[in-house]
């Protein structure tokens, strides 16, 4: 059952007002502050804040201990302080400029990221700003630094925040990639940065698949195979990793790429009845991307669709070493099991 936290950061479905939904955890209702309409009612109360008349002191203590334990994102933040034992005590005393804090909190709320991601981003920003101030250096373009810190924190929590999404959420940002390179060099995060880049595509694929409400076990291996095929097409060499992820997922939904595999048949879903422009717009709204950019990328991919299909077939089947039954073989008398042979590749 849905809770009030599921509506945080969403737009009003009636008047389309941006970030106008106000939640009431006690009444279990969500209302819009712009059109004054109740969006949802009868929602389940948060399990961590609901009143339990049968609760004991042991339950309360267990709840406090659980909140005190670090989560996956906050435990990853320990790698920074472990590299430099003096960094945690020094960075905790650094006071960030309100511009940087407001930018980071705004992006965090619009992107609907977990709270530990914001804490990790603030810790990275304090460590970076504290190091610059200790050497008497200025911190230029503080909003860009805040966005870069939040991007690193989101990738560490396996919820990547691509640059295109960041620019869509805040169009006033500048060269965020340059500030991110400065942060990585300043905090000695080169090894962590390489690991994040290796897992960026897979984590972003899972994030987009879940946003669209699709089956991960079906779309993830298929889209990864499409990513490999897109990398072999020279006409798409200028696309970034995030653009290729977007192209692979939308091709899997619109170009019937699942039927490209031999012996695979799929039924037409509701998205087949819609136009491609509507599918692109729906994905752009859920992924916080600009519709014009998504349309431009997909039009480029559709123009070279035969090349993508040829590269897709050359990539081979997703599951290597697939077995098939030999029709000419007879079942054994002992176990009644047919002899099988491995396909020659």
From Swiss-Prot:
Where it sits in the cell: the answer is: Nucleus
Taxonomic lineage is:
Eukaryota, Discoba, Euglenozoa, Kinetoplastea, Metakinetoplastina
Classification via InterPro entries: TFIIB, TFIIB_C_1, TFIIB_C_2
According to the record, what happens upon gene knockout?
RNAi-mediated knockdown in the procyclic form is lethal. Reduces SLRNA gene transcription. Reduces, to a lesser extent, RNA polymerase II-mediated synthesis of alpha-tubulin and HSP70 mRNAs.
Question: Which Pfam family, just one, is annotated for this protein?
Answer: TFIIB_C_2
Tell me what effect the entry lists for residue 295 to A. Moderate loss of SLRNA gene transcription
Cellular component GO terms, alphabetical: nucleus; transcription factor TFIIIB complex; transcription preinitiation complex
Superkingdom of the source species? Eukaryota
Spell out the protein name for this chain. Answer: Transcription initiation factor IIB
Q: Which organism is it from?
A: Trypanosoma brucei brucei
